[in-house]
Amino acid sequence: MSLIEFPLLDQTSSNSVISTTPNDLSNWSRLSSLWPLLYGTSCCFIEFASLIGSRFDFDRYGLVPRSSPRQADLILTAGTVTMKMAPSLVRLYEQMPEPKYVIAMGACTITGGMFSTDSYSTVRGVDKLIPVDVYLPGCPPKPEAVIDALTKLRKKISREIVEDRIRSQNKNRCFTTSHKLYVRRSTHTGTYEQELLYQSPSTLDISSENFYKSKSIVPSYKLVN
């Protein structure tokens, strides 16, 4: 039985027999029924939106976009992923039923892009959060490249073995030590001026009386010049 195309039946015989395995049958049934969860945060997602039109017509691949992770088996991440949205992305991935797949679309999703050099809040690769099946580089990738990534994912599904998929999910994932989520007290207290006026004496180098006294001695025009 062909893993991607339909099996060629014997046209000369009325009693054709198709032999396959449950694993191959399961893979074949999922090739043209991928339901993606679209997770776009930047300009790369605009290129994916053009696939909905009649020029590329991504419906021919059986893609049905879903807004709920519980009904999707493919999540397509496009754009920058920040540390603040990282827990939400992981939660969406965990809510997806098995088997599930991930396509990382664009340089910002794969490596952090131009924000990965000096940004303190950008995740340098979505594969640090969730396992990625297909990497789609580009800034942004063209719609033809997205179709090619979907084709490669379908080929991967056709050769998939259930035992290997379960074994790969049980492995421990490593995270970079420079990107960790710390729980901190909120700094938005609304008492910014009060904190400056009512500092403890131990934190001040000079007393408030000497400060205002020295400030009144220096003329304002000397401070400007």
From Swiss-Prot:
Cofactor, free-text remark: Binds 1 [4Fe-4S] cluster.
GO molecular function, a single term: NADH dehydrogenase (ubiquinone) activity
Subcellular location: Plastid, Chloroplast thylakoid membrane
Membrane topology: Peripheral membrane protein
InterPro entries according to UniProt: NADH_UbQ_OxRdtase-like_20kDa, NADH_UQ_OxRdtase_20Kd_su
Recorded GO CC terms: chloroplast thylakoid membrane; respiratory chain complex I
Superkingdom to which the source organism belongs: Eukaryota
Enzyme Commission identifier(s): 7.1.1.-
Main function: NDH shuttles electrons from NAD(P)H:plastoquinone, via FMN and iron-sulfur (Fe-S) centers, to quinones in the photosynthetic chain and possibly in a chloroplast respiratory chain. The immediate electron acceptor for the enzyme in this species is believed to be plastoquinone. Couples the redox reaction to proton translocation, and thus conserves the redox energy in a proton gradient.
Complexes and interactors: NDH is composed of at least 16 different subunits, 5 of which are encoded in the nucleus.
PANTHER family: NADH DEHYDROGENASE, NADH DEHYDROGENASE [UBIQUINONE] IRON-SULFUR PROTEIN 7, MITOCHONDRIAL
Name of the molecule in the record: NAD(P)H-quinone oxidoreductase subunit K, chloroplastic
Protein species of origin: Brachypodium distachyon (Purple false brome)
